[in-house]
Amino acid sequence: ELLSTVKSDERNYKAVQYGMYLVANSANGTAYSTFYDYPVAVAAKTGSAQRGEGSTANASFVCYAPYDDPQVAVAVVVEKGAAGSSIAVLAREVLDAYFSIQSSNESVDSEMTLLQ
């Protein structure tokens, strides 16, 4: 059930989407080292939340793919994970599982099924 929507000019959405594309596909992007050679175009955002002086930050990473026609979205949060760029590989593994299932015409039995 859709609870609400954000109303904004289409160019604002496009700017955010392109920024997320650059995170994974530009040499300066914080997730580039994880996705530069990925066969499907990915859009992503890395993040970290400080926990106080002397504590390791919590890490977050979100992405969707394919960039131009999204089929799947992944969110990863790791307590004391330091930085989103350091956990991007976990999202890549989820995408690997998803796209290998898609290419082999297998299906997941139900929502919330853990892919192994």
Predicted regions and their residues:
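Active-site beta-strand/loop architecture of penicillin-binding DD-peptidases
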Residues: 1-5, 11-105
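Ligand-recognition elements built from short beta-strands and adjacent flexible loops
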Residues: 105-116
